[in-house]
Regions:
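Single conserved hydrophobic/aromatic residue that forms the stacking wall/gate
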Residues: 1-9, 13
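Long hydrophobic alpha-helical segments typical of transmembrane helices together
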Residues: 140-169
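Glycine-centered tight beta-turn/hairpin loop motif at sheet-sheet or coil-to-beta transitions
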Residues: 17-19
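Short beta-strand segments
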Residues: 21-24, 132
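Short helix-loop capping/hinge motifs at secondary-structure junctions, enriched
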Residues: 43, 117-119, 167
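Short beta-strand micro-motifs in enzyme catalytic cores
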Residues: 10-11, 57, 107-109
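Unchanged
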Residues: 33-34, 65-151
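Conserved Nudix-box catalytic region and its N-terminal flanking loop in Nudix hydrolases
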Residues: 24-27, 33-78, 169
Length: 169
């Protein structure tokens, strides 16, 4: 197996407190950008996409992988346009998080998009998804019932709801 960083997998050797060493395989990832589109009525746009790893259609926030050196904010705006056919007047950062801290260097950068305007979707040739506007309260209930299983979507919906409930957004 190729372990070069350009292929995404590398070994890390760590000296333990007792003097021994351990080896960890680390996946090197350029990161991702995630966007929470919120319309004037308080609906968020989720996408439904078949995920082969789980053999089912998954509810997700629009998101995508970053290319090497790509600005996360520009990637988030691109995903909003490509996956939802939307642009926005205002973007508010919700920060970043590490989705898989045990073996992966991925950081997901997250924004809320408001002042939405419809444009045209531009899906990749191998991308098949359906956007759907859902009231935030319904998305929250979907998280709580386990209908939304995607980690970035769970984190985004819960953080957005908390910030709105606290009047911080």
């Amino acid at each position: 197996r190729d372990r070069s960083p350009s292929r995404g997998l590398g070994d890390v050797y760590k000296r333990q407190e007792d003097g021994s060493t351990s080896t960890r395989e680390i996946v090197h990832h350029h990161g991702g950008a995630c966007i929470l589109p919120v319309d004037a009525d308080g609906n968020i746009t989720l996408v439904r996409q078949f995920r082969y790893a789980f053999g089912e259609e998954i509810w997700e926030l629009p998101a995508g992988k970053l290319e090497a050196g790509e600005d996360p904010f520009e990637a988030a705006k691109r995903e909003l346009s490509e996956e939802c056919g939307l642009t926005a007047d205002k973007y508010t950062s919700l920060g970043e998080f590490y989705p898989t801290v045990g073996y992966d260097t991925e950081i997901i950068y997250t924004w809320v998009a408001t002042g939405l305007h419809e444009t045209r979707m531009h899906l990749d040739a191998d991308e098949f998804l359906t956007p759907d506007r859902v009231p935030l309260a319904q998305a929250y209930e979907m998280v709580m019932r386990g209908e939304i299983k995607d980690g970035k979507t769970i984190a985004g919906v819960l953080k957005l709801k908390a910030l709105l409930d606290e009047g911080k957004l």
